[in-house]
């Protein structure tokens, strides 16, 4: 797999916090190798969508249907589960607690990864996230905690819980001082792109 360099990456962004952010990985073999040891490695299908193609004015439009990946019904199945799989490959996941905030799909990946590797998942949800989604997380073994009216509130609570309870923060967002895990998480999606 290869990628195209963005000639504007970093331009106009003279901020020291951006310096340590690594270039994106294009290594699809690593996620496939690690994930196929635990999860079904079968590629997800491409689905033609003629109606949408017509609406947007193109001849053909194909959509990568990720709903069945890992049985999650989620388009973000690969990311967090891959991070936990990498920890497991180093013998560092079993019994570990992972904490995150989610407004949807990311939490399912954390829960599935934790469940697969004998870890614990704690997922913070804002009060506005439907209870049906909380039930889906619980069905994957996650402990669900409610905090705040918006995602940012639940993210702050997850970060605080990581510190207070010795849990491993696994966010799909990055910020100054927290980029290694999100970078690894994004590497997991290389598997999807290679398909």
Regions inferred by a protein language model and the residue ranges of each:
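PLP-dependent amino-acid enzyme catalytic core
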Residues: 1-195
